[in-house]
A protein has these predicted regions:
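Surface-exposed, charge/polar-rich loops and edge strands
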Residues: 1-189
Length: 189
């Protein structure tokens, strides 16, 4: 979990500044964790969308077509395995893919974006919670990519079939519910 990794990195960064006695009692030594049943209707999982900055849409779409060709992925809107919405300031394009090796839609997208970013150092990607925020950023001249809804029942089969989940696969809860990340850290830096 990225939050756990962030908490550990924070602890590792302050640990050298503490005495042995302070290390044993400092609150940053521990993390806040919640154990819950994923099957509970109270747990809502949402896809985390992508926004690409600093890339011309034509360049990214051409790279996506080349990536799909290399991977044997068919681009089609006829009974697609996965469906994405690509947003620019002027257009919204529905892109369907079939014959994907990844058991999760986000896996295909992450592989393609990773390859693109490696060859285009001027471009960056950010991980965005919420469709409205993706649309707002795309309207400003960036490229928004809306992932399909993340289905809870796809989580464990996705891990079994694909191994480690791709970066920022899903979020539990809505963006505005994530305030605790900041508030808990503020208790004591």
């Amino acid at each position: 979990n990225h939050s756990l990794a962030t908490a550990k990195a924070h602890w590792e960064s302050i640990k050298p500044t503490l005495s042995e006695a302070e290390r044993k009692t400092h609150p940053a030594r521990w993390c806040l964790a919640e154990v819950c049943n994923l099957h509970s209707p109270a747990i809502q999982m949402e896809a985390i969308h992508r926004v690409v900055f600093g890339a011309p849409a034509a360049s990214l779409l051409l790279a996506a077509v080349e990536f799909c060709d290399q991977e044997g992925i068919e681009i089609t809107n006829q009974r697609p395995q996965y469906e994405y919405h690509v947003l620019t300031a002027r257009k919204q394009i529905k892109v369907g893919l079939r014959h994907c090796k990844s058991p999760l839609a986000v896996g295909v997208l992450e592989a393609m974006l990773g390859e693109y970013l490696a060859g285009h150092k001027e471009a960056t990607v950010d991980y965005i919670h919420g469709e409205s925020e993706v649309r707002r950023l795309a309207a400003e001249g960036n490229i928004g990519i809306l992932l399909p809804e993340f289905q809870k029942d796809g989580l464990f089969p996705g891990v079994v079939q694909g191994g480690v989940l791709p970066k920022k696969t899903f979020s539990i809860g809505h963006a505005e519910e994530k305030r605790c990340y900041f508030e808990c850290r503020r208790i004591r830096p």
